[in-house]
Amino acid sequence: MKNLYRYSCGEGKLDFVMLHGWGMNSNAWRYIINRFGSHFRLHLFDLPGYGFSQSEESFTLPEISETVLKKAPPQAIWLGWSMGGCIASEIALRYPERVLALITVCSSPCFVSQHQWPRISWQVLSCFEQKLEDHLQNTLEQFLLLQTLGTLNSQRDTTSLKSFLFSRPLPKKEVLKAGLKILRYTDMRDSLNAISVPFLRIYGKLDALVPCKIAELLDEAWPHTESVIMHQSAHVPFISHTDDFLEVILYFYQKYFSH
C-alpha cells in the first residue's frame, strides 16, 4: 500500500508507535500527543483503509502488520488500542527485533467469547456487520457510544470521538468488515505468552467492550507481563483520563528505559 498515512512528532529520543482501533483513525490520539511529545518521538498511523490511508481493499491481520511495519522506525515501543492491540501484538510476535516494548490499551488477545473467557459474543459482532450494509455512519456512531458507556463524562467523550472520526474520510464497508473478522477470529492467548520484551496491558474498569476481568486471567497466564486497571475509565482512557493515562505510560517507560 503506497498511501499509508503516518504522522511523526515529538522531541524524545525513543521512537513510540501508536495504533488506533476499529473504525477510528489516528486522530484518536489528539489529546495526548502534545504531552507525549516531550518524552518520545511519536509515530501515529492511520491503519490501511482508515482515515487518510484510504483503500478499496480489505486487509488481513498479517497484511496490516507488514504494511505498517514498512513505514515504522527500526525499533520502537509499540502501543495498540483495541484492535490496534492485536496488530501491535502480531508485530511483536513476528518481528520481535523491531519491538522494544509492547503496550496494549483496552485490548484482548481473544475478542470473542470462548469457554471460561469473558468477551463480546460473536452475535454482537455479527449485528455490527449486518448494520454496516445499510447504515455505515450510524453503526460507527453506535460503536463510539459503547466506548464511553458508564463514565462520568460519557457525552463529552463521545462528542470528542465523533469529531476525531469525522474529521477524516470514513473507512469503506469492506475494510470495516475485514476488521470485524480480525476481532472475531484472532486468538493470541497462547502465543503471546512467548513475548520476552516488557509488556504492559491497560484496562478500563467500566469498559463495555473489553471486560477488565481479563486482566486477572492474563496476570495468571502471563506472569511476566504487567497490567493496570483504570477504575473510572471505559474503552478510551487516553481521552477520558488523559493525565492518569500518561502517568501509567511514563511509569512503565521509566521502569525499563530511563537508565
UniProtKB/Swiss-Prot annotation:
It holds the Pfam family Abhydrolase_1. One of its GO terms (cellular component) is cytoplasm. The active site is at S82, D207, H235. Residues 16-241 form the AB hydrolase-1 domain. GO terms for biological process: biotin biosynthetic process. One of its GO terms (molecular function) is pimelyl-[acyl-carrier protein] methyl ester esterase activity. Disulfide bonds: none annotated. Keywords: Biotin biosynthesis, Cytoplasm, Hydrolase, Serine esterase. Substrate binds at W22, S82, M83, F143, L144, L145, L146, Q147, H235. InterPro entries: AB_hydrolase_1, AB_hydrolase_fold, AB_hydrolase_sf, BioH. Monomer. Belongs to the AB hydrolase superfamily. Carboxylesterase BioH family. The physiological role of BioH is to remove the methyl group introduced by BioC when the pimeloyl moiety is complete. It allows to synthesize pimeloyl-ACP via the fatty acid synthetic pathway through the hydrolysis of the ester bonds of pimeloyl-ACP esters. This is Pimeloyl-[acyl-carrier protein] methyl ester esterase. It comes from Hamiltonella defensa subsp. Acyrthosiphon pisum (strain 5AT). The lineage of its organism: Bacteria, Pseudomonadati, Pseudomonadota, Gammaproteobacteria, Enterobacterales. The gene is bioH.
